[in-house]
């Protein structure tokens, strides 16, 4: 399991590479946020229910429906209009999800060569986009109504992108450069 790998191998390795004197200085993954945006299709309750069901299967916990905060006439949406769902994973569920992401989902993704340094936000967090949520084995292909995308945000307590990249490389996430 990745949590045991982190404690036994990754922490000592990063402590040596980054030159930290204290184990608590070593960066760690704080949480993983998953988001499925439906846009205008969110008004269809059938699509919204399938989105919530699929994200619950992927994450292993019940997602929260997200809605529009302000009305925007150009997009033809009103305040309170459902547009997607999200879920935040921490601790054991987070490590279980990351294990499935690294070893199952990313290798199954079409045209995936690796993650780019440009996907970091400057504070040590990375955002990954999955084009088809059917890459996850938990989702039954016969029961889905529409193939949707999935946004994955991995939040770390690293102070910069370099430290976060080293941490994620130790976990086994592939990087292009």
Swiss-Prot record:
Protein name: Large ribosomal subunit protein uL5
Lineage: Bacteria, Pseudomonadati, Pseudomonadota, Alphaproteobacteria, Rickettsiales
A Pfam entry, by short name: Ribosomal_L5
Alphabetical list of Gene3D superfamilies matching this protein: 3.30.1440.10
Keyword entries, A-Z: Ribonucleoprotein, Ribosomal protein, RNA-binding, rRNA-binding, tRNA-binding
Purpose: This is one of the proteins that bind and probably mediate the attachment of the 5S RNA into the large ribosomal subunit, where it forms part of the central protuberance. In the 70S ribosome it contacts protein S13 of the 30S subunit (bridge B1b), connecting the 2 subunits; this bridge is implicated in subunit movement. Contacts the P site tRNA; the 5S rRNA and some of its associated proteins might help stabilize positioning of ribosome-bound tRNAs.
GO molecular function, one term: tRNA binding
Oligomeric form and interacting partners: Part of the 50S ribosomal subunit; part of the 5S rRNA/L5/L18/L25 subcomplex. Contacts the 5S rRNA and the P site tRNA. Forms a bridge to the 30S subunit in the 70S ribosome.
Signal peptide: none
Listed SUPFAM superfamilies: RL5-like (SSF55282)
GO biological process: translation
